[in-house]
Amino acid sequence: MERAIKNFLSQESAGGILLMIAVALAMIMANSPLSGMYQGFLDTEMQVRVGSLDIDKTLIHWINDGLMALFFMLIGLEVKRELLEGALSSAAQASLPTFAAVGGMVFPAGIYLLFNYGDPVTQAGWAIPAATDIAFALGVMALLGSRVPVSLKVFLLALAIIDDLGVVVIIAMFYSTDLSMLSLIVAGIAILGLVGLNRKGVTALGPYGVVGLILWIAVLKSGVHATLAGVIIAFCIPLRAKDGSSPSESLEHSLHPWSTFIILPIFAFANAGVDLSPMSFGDLLSPVPVGIALGLLLGKPLGVLVFSYIGVKLKMAVLPEGMGWKHIAPVALMCGIGFTMSMFISSLAFVGDAEAYGDFARLGILVGSFASAIIGYFWLAKVLPEVDVAKESKKGEIA
């Protein structure tokens, strides 16, 4: 189990660096003579037609609805594993990150709504600063190497997973519109099919893939966001087979490199390009970007710390061994790295006539996320013990 966690953490670390490169490239293209080509590329129409079934979307929608469904499937697999066998499998293990995650969603949303009070259009973005980007946050933490205790990494990982689960619930409840009953019925039948496969002990992934594709198409057509299909599929895939193997973990390990090195960087490149040329200084200080940036930079750490403190004081949660509040505080700041998850919610919150707010939202996400990353990194570096270079070198020679 420890080896699996280490492999996961190191892979997410490398992914964080790749995400930074993708964001930088998107910003350069969006603010250069290549901006027209960049936007035109994202607006390219792509159509899939099989008989009477017709799916016609722009490239950016294929990325957000299709590729991100695979990412959310990975989230579902991680959540299921941690709930059944991992860091969230007991009340004692799950209590502190659960308190922290809830506070880390409530406070940022409250700060955003405070800045956007009275405007029903911009209020739709209340959930944008409530998300944490697990890849980016772990990537920043990994820059400190062996100085970071495993308990601190597991705390951040568990918190981010619960946060992701909260985001899934938020999307299902608040960002699904114009529902199609026929498509929902087809989706319901597909879900029953997936549950049936699980109950019958089917461990081959092929049947889940076929029924899962039907579910994704039905959910896409239903008005509920298509990424939720990925989570449902993940929850239906068996964690353990009779021979002790794990179909769920096998798929999780297969999806990880695709998600880390392809899906998330593509998503970041497609969604992070903000054209700054038409913006004035007043636009930068408007309620949407300020509410998001402060929600991430102040709301996230405050929520994580306050709710964690309440949980500990009520004796409903305990700090992991070797961890103190001086460690929790900078990690709470790193939870303000919303980035890809926040951008994803932004793409759902500001659509149609409100789409113009999307650039403001992305700007707030970038400012809040990068500020949280920088301050969190230097704060954590200050409170962690220095590595004994001579000792580490000696260890390497012995190995």
Curated annotation (Swiss-Prot):
Keywords: Antiport, Cell inner membrane, Cell membrane, Ion transport, Membrane, Sodium, Sodium transport, Transmembrane, Transmembrane helix, Transport. Belongs to the NhaA Na(+)/H(+) (TC 2.A.33) antiporter family. It is found in: Cell inner membrane. It comes from the Bacteria. One of its GO terms (biological process) is regulation of pH. GO terms for cellular component: plasma membrane. Gene3D superfamilies: Na+/H+ antiporter like domain (1.20.1530.10). It is a multi-pass membrane protein. PANTHER family: NA(+)_H(+) ANTIPORTER NHAA, SODIUM ION/PROTON ANTIPORTER NHAA-RELATED. It catalyses: Na(+)(in) + 2 H(+)(out) = Na(+)(out) + 2 H(+)(in). Na(+)/H(+) antiporter that extrudes sodium in exchange for external protons. GO terms for molecular function: sodium:proton antiporter activity. The chain crosses the membrane at residues 14-34, 59-79, 95-115, 124-144, 154-174, 177-197, 213-233, 261-281, 290-310, 331-351, 363-383. This is Na(+)/H(+) antiporter NhaA.
